[in-house]
């Protein structure tokens, strides 16, 4: 697990945000393709064997599978950069740091201009606290010894 200073996490944010946006796009694409597949399957069931266009079904499956692979890659890229996706649907990420000799998370949500909050590892989004001078003076990005 990588530990970040606030400055390091902020510096990593543009790359991580790009990967997060890619993940959200590919998740949407895979869900859309799966929705079309589900509707077609339901239509076949409801009609007792309606005709379907096999090439269209193959194309939808390929689109879904390609999007799922791209989604997984984007999530892997976020992890490689050192961030942790906490909630993909709302674009919530954490970066680990140390504050007063304990592990805490620098917390960022898609749409926020900068990393401005932190929380304990078990507190989650609802436990977010603003980064203040006290936090800045007592946090560091070094792993515990």
Where are these regions (language model features)?
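Heptad-repeat coiled-coil alpha-helices
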Residues: 32, 36-39, 43-46, 53, ...
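A short, surface-exposed helix-loop junction/capping segment
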Residues: 48-60
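Alpha-helix boundary/capping detector
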Residues: 35-36, 42, 56, 104-105, ...
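Glycine-rich, aromatic-bearing surface loops/beta-hairpins
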Residues: 65, 72-145
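Amphipathic alpha-helical coiled-coil segments
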Residues: 16-33, 60, 64-67, 71-74, ...
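Long, hydrophobic N-terminal alpha-helical segment
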Residues: 1-43
